[in-house]
């Protein structure tokens, strides 16, 4: 239903569930890519599933300028093992959010599956180098 101020109004006890196309995680796996002329920041929920006992969910924020990006993980939980590291870089005016297998881990999680949801926030100011 249409909500106030251009929002979407949901009925009580209505939620979203995500089971999108998953991405296998290997070295330098690009999870998402966006142009900084369109968006300046994004809020991610990343769900990682390796097997029945190794699962992880990560909440992170990304903000980017013309030649730099900053990523902050503000929430993370798992069943005992960190599975991935998350980073963001700017390359030719595009932000890439990248997953790598956890560098400090004692297990090999090669091929873990990632699913994500994201809210993008539009760039307001013109890009000036």
Residues of each region from the PLM?
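Terminal beta-strand-rich extracellular "head" domains
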Residues: 61-85
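Parallel beta-helix/beta-solenoid repeats that form elongated, surface-exposed shafts/blades used
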Residues: 1, 57-60, 84-87
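Low-complexity intrinsically disordered segments
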Residues: 77-129
